[in-house]
Each structure stands twice: as structure tokens, then as C-alpha cells.
Amino acid sequence: MSLIKNFKHIIFSFSLLFFISCATTIDLNKDNKNNILDGLISNNPSYKSLDALLYVDIESQTMLHIKKGTVLKKYDISSSVYGTGSIANSLKTPLGKHEIYKKIGDKLPVNAILKGRVWNGAIATIIKDPIDTDYDHVTSRIMWLDGLELGKNKGDGIDSRDRYIYIHGTAEEGLIGKPAS
């Protein structure tokens, strides 16, 4: 299944999702993947009650789809080429807990190009080579994020929703796996 189809599957699969960015590496080679949330739960007991969450590991450029403590799928991602941070207009990937504010594009064709969260009628040509283009299309679907931590990713000058922070498709699939967004 292609990355875009997997991405589409994620969007349609959840009724409650959280996006967590952090710099902790998760070892997916552990024998018991059911215990992957142990470290997260010890710092955030409320995670134990979550049916599903997406966990983003900035260091390894991966996102895990976790359901009831079990890793269902690992996805390679691309965070911001400018690093991590929450300051408005910094173009950086914010850290911390987020929830999905809005899903956009559920009825659009795969690789539809969205500008300003609206399909412009065009379909992106997917670039499999590690080529950074000038256009950086947002494609297929958008999961618009809302920060949940006042002073970290929510509030004046640092608000993830106001900054239009998304999980989204890209035409530059050859760059996935390293900071390139």
C-alpha cells in the first residue's frame, strides 16, 4: 500500500487522535510492542485511557499509530527543515500534545493539491527521488492540529492551530524520512 493510501487510511480510521512530538526514540525492535506506551504513560497517565494516538518521534522521523497500547503501523515522516519550536512564523515543528482540530479532504482524490486548505483542482506528480522542489505541495489530506499545552503550543505567538500546523501528504515522497518540510 502506498504512503498516500496509508495516510488516507489513518485519517479515516480514528475518531480520537492525538499527535505528540518529542525527541525520545522508540525501539520498535523490542519483543513486546504492547508495552511501547509504558514510558509515555508514566509521564502522562491520561494516555492509558486513549483508544488511539499518533506518536511522532522527531529524532527518527517516524510516526507510530498506536491503538490500545499496541503499535499498529510505523510511518516515515518529514518534520520541518528548520527544526523544532513553536514561535509564530518560525516554520518549525511544534513539540507537545496536540489534538486534531479539523480533517480536510476526505472526499478528494489521492494526490489532490490543497492551497489554503482548499483543493485547487490539480493532482500532484509524486517525486520518488530525494529532490526538494520549490513548490512544496500539501497533498491528499490535512489533519489540522490544535495545541493542548498553554505556553508551549497554545496561546499568543505560539498557537499551533493559528500557525496552521498539519499532518499532510506531500508530492516529495523521496524526502520523507528526514527533515524537509
Stretches with model-predicted labels:
Residues 2-11:
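Bacterial N-terminal signal peptides that target proteins for export
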Residues 22-181:
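N-terminal pre-domains immediately preceding structured catalytic cores
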Residues 11-19:
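Bacterial N-terminal signal peptides
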Residues 2, 18, 22-23:
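A detector of low-complexity, intrinsically disordered, Ser/Thr/Gly/Pro/Ala-rich segments
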